[in-house]
Amino acid sequence: MRDHNPAKNYPLNQWCMGTMHEARGWTNTILIQDSLLYKYVNSLPVYKCPADRATTRSPWGGGGIPKVRSLAMSCFMNPLPGESRGRGKTYRKQSDFVLGPAMTWVTIDENPSSINDGWFVHESQTGFVDYPASYHNNAGGLSFADGHSEIKKWKSPAVQTFGKRVMTNPTLDRLDATWLYDRTTDFTQPWR
């Protein structure tokens, strides 16, 4: 029997358990329904961009099945203990948003070739650890701490076509990485 108290099921502060790299996470809506956000936003379609047409090959053979989630949360939002990524301000409550809620993104549509857990790691002005999605004519969605959302047009070929072999453009990669970096956290170490 499952414990229906999400706080007990998430000892590591992960907003949504499971992984999108294996079959049991692809279609398991219980992972979303038991997530820490579901009691506030209890509609499954909200957790997947409608433009995400990616499927993952079924372990039973044949075609693919759609994944249930394309959404990931900034790794600086209530991070795992000891997993603050080593630099930057972590956010545990609204008053922690030193950049201001309108300049701090919370969730992002993550590229289907990059999405694994519930976190989106971004801590560099020069490149990406996890890659944003580009479902909307090379653009992807983000939500911010003040409640607004944005569709960001990505310039980098690496972001636009992640998961395919493409040549990167360091200048364009840096433009996209810096744009997201400036809206991620206050990096307290002199990295800029």
Model-derived segments and their meaning:
Residues 1-192:
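Short, well-structured segments within or immediately adjacent to enzyme catalytic domains
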